[in-house]
């Protein structure tokens, strides 16, 4: 094997080229590659974090929706209970008012009935006395009249 100066020159030039590349070209390339890798890793981490945040937000939204439905059902149930209570109170009040009106009516009827009975008793007593006077054709003294009226009223 024969080494000539061209081969040695090429070897020296290649070594200088490799040293130059290692010193000036390789570090910026490695920095660019590392920076790119870091950005990609950060992007993937951000994407994973965003996916987790999205899942968390969806779970939270689902929970809030369930809570809202439960709350709405509770409100509807309370409203139905209140409605039933109001209807029951209205029925109770109406029944009480009806009973009161019926009692007043019965009391008025009873009072009117008693008044009419008393008037009829007086009229019957007066008619009986008038009939008796006509039959006897004489006038009864006031004491006897009063006594007869009282007896007739008691009998009637």
Swiss-Prot record:
GO terms for cellular component: plasma membrane; proton-transporting ATP synthase complex. Gene3D superfamilies: F1F0 ATP synthase subunit B, membrane domain. It is a single-pass membrane protein. The chain crosses the membrane at residues 7-27. It is found in: Cell inner membrane. Its main location: membrane. One of its GO terms (molecular function) is proton-transporting ATP synthase activity, rotational mechanism. The keyword Acetylation does not apply. Belongs to the ATPase B chain family. This is ATP synthase subunit b. It comes from Shewanella baltica (strain OS155 / ATCC BAA-1091). The gene is atpF.
